[in-house]
Amino acid sequence: MSLVVLKLGGSVVTDKDEPETVDEAGLAAAADAVAPLAESRRVVVVHGGGSFGHHHAAEHGVSSESGSHDARGVRAIHDAMKRLNDAVLDALEERGVAALPVHPLSAGAREADGSLSLPLAATETMLDEGFVPVLHGDVISHAGKGATIVSGDDLVVSLASGLGADRVGLCSTVPGVLDADGDVIPEITAFADAADALGGSDSTDVTGGMAAKVRKLLALGAPAHVFGPEGLSAFVAGESPGTVIRGE
């Protein structure tokens, strides 16, 4: 059975203007789309932090680059993400999806150079037993820095490459990768295809924005689709909404 890794951006499932506020309509629509997918495919879901994780991360000065050894602060960020994860799990369970949590803080770590180590034995066994693992952006122990943030995008790349995903979907509030005129680029097979629109470099992309995302997705062995909420049903149906990123 084929494997799909699907990321739900934090801005899709939360109200990013209000701390720790779920976007009930957005989450319901996302869960409605995931349910039929889980009936016919093996699925791993990843969700972003939205107004849960980002609020606490900013308060405690923790980012993907800046770490902390303050256990109380690290727990505050992680606990907020668990609350959002519970909301996502509940929405999926209400639709008959056998969803289980996988918390990155307990599952992985970063090396001193920032490379992510994410053992996948537990996730793979969940899939084999018919469960839908649900991961999330989180704090993660980082050699030499205490704990830093691991983004949902980083998790998607590790999961897709480590588990051999057949398709990857990233649903956010933008309809795809946009060109300089604001139009969706249908397909990217090399970074040069989008370099002008993305500024040609991700050197200033400290939060892991679109340029960094495109570079990472080009390295995958599976096609990755970047789309907005309106494209989620099409992706689930096997179509190619938004931008497809396919490294050659």
Curated annotation (Swiss-Prot):
Q: Which reaction does it catalyse?
A: isopentenyl phosphate + ATP = isopentenyl diphosphate + ADP
What are the binding positions for substrate in this chain?
G49, H54, G152
Q: Name one GO cellular component term.
A: cytosol
Q: What is its EC number?
A: 2.7.4.26
Q: What Pfam families does the entry give?
A: AA_kinase (PF00696)
> Keyword Cytoplasm, does the record have it?
no
GO terms (molecular function) for this protein are: ATP binding; isopentenyl phosphate kinase activity; kinase activity
The Gene Ontology biological process annotation of the record reads:
terpenoid biosynthetic process
Keyword vocabulary terms for this entry: ATP-binding, Isoprene biosynthesis, Kinase, Lipid biosynthesis, Lipid metabolism, Nucleotide-binding, Transferase
InterPro entries in the record? AceGlu_kinase-like_sf (IPR036393), Asp/Glu/Uridylate_kinase (IPR001048), Fosfomycin_R_FomA-type (IPR024192)
Q: Where is this site: Transition state stabilizer?
A: K16
In which residues is ATP bound?
K7, L8, G9, G10, S11, G50, G209, K213
**Origin superkingdom:** Archaea
Q: What does this protein do?
A: Catalyzes the phosphorylation of isopentenyl phosphate (IP) to isopentenyl diphosphate (IPP). Functions in an alternate mevalonate (MVA) pathway leading to IPP, a key precursor for the biosynthesis of isoprenoid compounds such as archaeal membrane lipids.
Q: Which family does it belong to?
A: Belongs to the isopentenyl phosphate kinase family.
Q: How does it assemble?
A: Homodimer.
State the name under which the record lists this protein. Answer: Isopentenyl phosphate kinase
Question: Organism, per UniProt?
Answer: Haloferax volcanii (strain ATCC 29605 / DSM 3757 / JCM 8879 / NBRC 14742 / NCIMB 2012 / VKM B-1768 / DS2) (Halobacterium volcanii)
